[in-house]
A protein has these predicted regions:
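Catalytic alpha-helical scaffold of carbohydrate-active enzymes acting on polysaccharides/glycoconjugates
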Residues: 1-134, 141-164
């Protein structure tokens, strides 16, 4: 029988300030459900390190909120954000990079691409405990061939796209 390979990818995004806005709007139940969704993937993989792999993209705007001490304190009764980030650091997840403020690269000025990419890499290294990110998840799957030289400069080896 032929070998079978399967890649599972998951992208998580949260507009900047949205978790706090939901919490303050009376829709705190929604923020609670969202935060639990961020905690679940790594729990699902625990105990299956020998066979389970996940490619995961966390948007820069989500990472910025997860880093924010005020967000961590506000939601500490729901989930331990530092705890699940620590489990992410130790897990069998391959994180893929992105742009910090979820830019649609082909619609953004090319002069901004490097900064968006570098900012995400700095935050990703800090919060996710990885030095390198081999894959890149373009926000909104916005990709154009002109991005390739920039992505190579930042050490990326592959890009997840839905079509070319």
């Amino acid at each position: 029988m032929a070998d079978v390979y399967h890649a599972l990818g998951l992208h998580m995004h949260q507009p900047l300030g949205n978790l706090a806005a939901l919490h303050n709007s009376g829709e705190s139940w929604e923020a609670r459900q969202i935060l639990w969704c961020y905690d679940r993937p790594v729990r699902m993989l625990e105990g299956y390190e020998d066979i389970a792999r996940l490619h995961m993209s966390l948007s820069g705007t989500l990472l910025k909120q997860l880093e924010d001490p005020a967000v961590r304190q506000t939601f500490s009764d729901i989930v331990n954000i530092e705890g699940f980030l620590d489990r992410y650091r130790r897990s069998n997840i391959e994180f893929v990079g992105s742009g910090l403020y979820h830019p649609v690269y082909p619609l953004s000025p090319p002069a901004d691409w490097d900064a968006q990419t570098e900012w995400w890499l700095g935050l990703g290294r800090h919060l996710l405990g990885r030095e390198r990110f081999e894959g890149f998840w373009p926000p909104e799957m916005g990709f154009c061939m002109e991005m390739i030289p920039m992505l190579k400069r930042h050490g990326y080896r592959y890009v997840l796209v839905d079509s070319l």
